[in-house]
Regions:
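A cross-family signal for N-terminal binding/gating loops and helix N-caps
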Residues: 1-107, 111-115
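Phosphate/anion-contacting hairpin/loop surfaces
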Residues: 69-177
Length: 177
């Protein structure tokens, strides 16, 4: 599952590649991935991509008019930058964000479909994705220690609980330990 370091790389690359570019269209390749439809995918066409950031393990792509695409890659979801108008891979292609100079593909390998795409409007709609975990890259050592001691958890459980620490999961908790 992509965690903090992986998500940071996605965000940095996406900002470098697509910032300020208008989205030509948003294609949905598999309807299960779309977990909300207000606004509909068609409402994103023509809107400039403004920036990307993270809420926990979710990537937030902000477009003009306070339109947001919130992506949770889960275990096997990945993002790929391809040539303009790239076809979605059969079976694994979930969604495509088409820009004039390239296409951002959301794919998920494996048979279980866990990745999610939420389309929301208005900054207030993003609150539902907040789990409350401490953003470790902005935290002081004292805040980090307090977060780990706040509840009666094993160290492994505290590291992987999104209400304690944001964007750290099983893979990187093992590295930390």
């Amino acid at each position: 599952m992509p965690e903090l370091p992986d998500l940071t790389v996605y965000l940095e690359r996406l900002e470098a590649i697509a910032r300020d570019a208008p989205l030509q269209r948003l294609r949905i390749g598999n309807p299960f991935v779309l977990r909300s439809v207000a606004p509909p995918p068609s409402a994103f066409a023509g809107r400039r991509f403004l920036r990307a950031w993270r809420i926990g393990k979710r990537l937030v792509l902000e477009f003009e008019g306070e339109h947001y695409a919130v992506i949770h890659l889960m275990i096997l979801g990945r993002l790929h930058w391809k040539k303009p108008g790239a076809a979605m891979p059969k079976g694994s292609g979930l969604a495509a964000f088409d820009f004039e100079h390239g296409t951002l593909l959301l794919v998920e390998h494996g048979s279980k479909r866990r990745a999610a795409l939420h389309l929301v409007q208005g900054r207030g709609a993003l609150a539902e994705f907040e789990r409350g975990g401490l953003e470790v890259m902005q935290a002081t050592l004292e805040q980090f220690g307090e977060a780990l001691r706040r509840d009666n958890h094993t160290l492994k459980r505290a590291l992987t609980d999104p209400t304690v620490l944001a964007a750290i999961g099983n893979a990187y908790s093992d590295e930390i330990l």
